[in-house]
C-alpha cells in the first residue's frame, strides 16, 4: 500500500497549487477566432458579442496559470503544464466573439451558452471525456454533436437546417427544437434523447 502511494504522488513533477482566494478579474482583448478548444476542468460561459475577448474571474494565483492563446481561428484555453491544482476555488471564464463554428472540450470542463448561437454557418461540438455543455437558442446551418466518453450535452430551442449526433461511450445527448433532417449514431451505452427535435 505504501509503495502505491509513493508511486502515485511521484507522477506530479510540478508544484502543488491551492487557490489563494484573493479574487481578481483579468480582461483581455483577443484576435478574431470562431473556434474554441478547452483542456482541463474549468467552466466557460460563452456569449455571442460584437468583439472577441475573454474575462477570467478567480484566485490571482490560479488565473495566472490559465493560458489563453489564439492559433489561426482557434482560441485555446488550458492550464500550464506540470502544475497540480488541488483547490481552484471559484473560477469563472467568460468568452465573447461575433461568431462560433466549432467547440472542443477535452477533459471534465463545461460550457454554458448564455444567449445561444446565431450563425449562417455550421456549428460542430466535440466532447472528449466527461465534459458537459448546455444552452438554448441554436440557429445554425448544420449542427454536429459528437461525444467520445461520458460527456453530457443538453441543447434546447434548436433551429438548424440539419443535425447529426454521435456517441462513442456512455455519454448523453438531449435535443429539442426543429431541424430539416437528423442523423444519430451510438457506439456503446450512450443515450440520445431527441423526441422533441422535430
What is the role of each PLM region?
Residues 11, 104-105:
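Beta-strand-rich solenoid/repeat architectures in extracellular/passenger domains
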Residues 66-67:
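Structured surface interface patches that mediate subunit assembly and partner/cofactor docking
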Residues 1, 6-63, 74-96, 111-113:
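Short acidic/polar N-terminal linker immediately downstream of export determinants
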Residues 5-8, 166-168, 185-187:
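Intrinsically disordered, low-complexity segments
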Amino acid at each position: 500500500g505504501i509503495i502505491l502511494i509513493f508511486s502515485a504522488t511521484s507522477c506530479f513533477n510540478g508544484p502543488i497549487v491551492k487557490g489563494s482566494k484573493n479574487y481578481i478579474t483579468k480582461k483581455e482583448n483577443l484576435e478574431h477566432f470562431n473556434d474554441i478548444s478547452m483542456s482541463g476542468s474549468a467552466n466557460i460561459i460563452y456569449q455571442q458579442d460584437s468583439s472577441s475577448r475573454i474575462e477570467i474571474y478567480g484566485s490571482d494565483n490560479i488565473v495566472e496559470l490559465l493560458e489563453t492563446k489564439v492559433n489561426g481561428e482557434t482560441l485555446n484555453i488550458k492550464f500550464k503544464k506540470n502544475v497540480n491544482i488541488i483547490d481552484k476555488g471559484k473560477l469563472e471564464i467568460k468568452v465573447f466573439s461575433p461568431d462560433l463554428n466549432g467547440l472542443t472540450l477535452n477533459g471534465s470542463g463545461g460550457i454554458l451558452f448564455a444567449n445561444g448561437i446565431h450563425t449562417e454557418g455550421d456549428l460542430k461540438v466535440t466532447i472528449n471525456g466527461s465534459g458537459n455543455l448546455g444552452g438554448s437558442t441554436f440557429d445554425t446551418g448544420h449542427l454536429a454533436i459528437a461525444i467520445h466518453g461520458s460527456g453530457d450535452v443538453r441543447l434546447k430551442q434548436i433551429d438548424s437546417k440539419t443535425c447529426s449526433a454521435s456517441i462513442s461511450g456512455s455519454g448523453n445527448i438531449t435535443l429539442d427544437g426543429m431541424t430539416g433532417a437528423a442523423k444519430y449514431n451510438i457506439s456503446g451505452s450512450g443515450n440520445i434523447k431527441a423526441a422533441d427535435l422535430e
